[in-house]
Regions:
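Per-ARNT-Sim (PAS) sensory domains and their PAS-associated C-terminal
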Residues: 2-5
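Catalytic acidic motif of RecA-like/P-loop NTPases
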Residues: 143-146, 158
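Sensory coupling linkers of modular signal transduction proteins
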Residues: 12-62
């Protein structure tokens, strides 16, 4: 609704005991931040978004055998990267929800959507997330910045010590060979970032039957359907496909298959037709 509330707690001694005076400041935002790529959410919203997604439903992160404790314990900036599609923003939301700063906001900054108003707010406003303290920032599409914008943004981060006062996450897409945009190599060096690679679906195709079963059960409840699973040959067809769009494509294909199936088991013909359209 365009209203922002800022809370500040100040410790004081009163009658021999430590008390906290909380002040609440109400202000109206001058621009609609979400329209320009800056969005705020809290821990509960992040948890709900994650567990309502394919990745939360299927627990596909555990399937990928990722060890996350080292990333939770460190305060260093983290680059989460991988092929397009394998759950990078969802991973950040899970790390935020499990991390020590989950009582403060998660601030998502999409550099591809900033445009002039968002960029001006980020770089010049005294309410910029870069000026904050004790928050979690997730920046995506850094490659959309010009070289000049990139230099200005990260010079500002370094000057304000944003990376020391907050937890920074960067979401990056890489090629199948693992190559990322040069901006990410620079920020890794500048900010001494940790790296977390999200494995593509093709690296554990053997898990497709289990993942399919879990997600189909949820789709049945959402859509009042009664699909049990795949015919054996259809299962084989799913595991032999390369899934270039990774989990996002896999999720979309399952949505279509369940929607258009009128029998208890999804046939191999239905699967082949859908994959041809991919």
């Amino acid at each position: 609704n365009g209203i922002r509330y800022a809370l500040q707690s100040t410790p004081i001694q009163m009658e021999g005991a430590l008390r906290h005076v909380v002040t609440i400041e109400k202000s109206r935002l001058s621009i609609p931040l979400e329209k320009y790529g800056i969005a705020y959410s809290d821990r509960q919203q992040a948890v709900d978004t994650f567990f309502d997604s394919f990745y939360g439903i299927t627990q596909s992160f555990s399937t990928a055998n990722l060890t996350l404790e080292q990333y939770l314990q460190s305060n260093r900036p983290l680059v989460v990267y991988g092929d397009p599609g394998p759950a990078k923003p969802q991973m950040v939301q899970m790390l935020y929800a499990k991390g020590p700063l989950s009582n403060a906001p998660l601030i998502k900054i999409d550099c591809a959507m900033l445009m002039h108003p968002g960029w001006k707010y980020l770089m010049a406003s005294d309410r910029s997330p870069l000026m904050g303290d004790g928050c979690t920032l997730m920046m995506s599409h850094v490659e959309a910045l010009t070289d000049e914008q990139f230099s200005e943004l990260f010079s500002t981060i370094m000057a304000l010590h944003t990376q020391e006062r907050n937890r920074l996450f960067f979401v990056a897409s890489s090629s199948s060979s693992g190559t990322m945009h040069p901006h990410y190599a620079r920020l890794v060096d500048m900010l001494n970032c940790l790296m977390l690679q999200m494995p593509p679906l093709r690296s554990h195709l053997q898990d497709i039957p289990r993942l399919s079963g879990l997600y189909i059960s949820t789709l049945n409840m959402r859509n009042a359907r009664a699909v049990i699973g795949f015919e054996p040959e259809a299962n084989l067809c799913m595991t032999e496909y390369s899934w270039p769009g990774n989990y996002d494509q896999f999720c979309r294909v399952l949505d279509e298959l369940v929607l258009h199936t009128t029998t208890p088991y999804i046939s191999v013909e239905t699967v082949r037709d859908q994959l041809k359209r991919e």
